[in-house]
Amino acid sequence: MTKQNETYPREEKLKAKRLIDELFITGKSVSKYPLRLVYIEVDEEGVPQFQTGVSVSKRYFKKAVDRNYYKRLLRETYRKNKHLLVDQMDKKFAMMLFYQTKDRLNYQEVEHKMKGLFEKFIKQQQATPTESDNQAI
């Protein structure tokens, strides 16, 4: 059994303001309560396959300590389960994960929801033809 790459290096963190702005303007989304994934396809050279950011709204958790806990939880569940995306996808994406509820879910519940969200994202990507596929027809 080979060990999956369960790292979350600096290059994979979504930090570029231009990409984040583009994500909110033209991004598509997939939801699996209480998580939401907003993404865009990236065609740039030298960027990793997935660049990911996380966000927890002040609307749901007033204390920074609570927001930071759920951001840490999202990053950890992404890191442990990103192999589901890497194994299935060959395109590059910039994506943002949102935690959208006041409910205080534990790690196992968030991980289960994250896996469901990734499966939904993969199905959506396999169902949508790309621009290059449309040009070939």
Task: Give short role names for the model-derived ranges.
Residues M1-I137:
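Positively charged, solvent-exposed patches that mediate nucleic-acid binding
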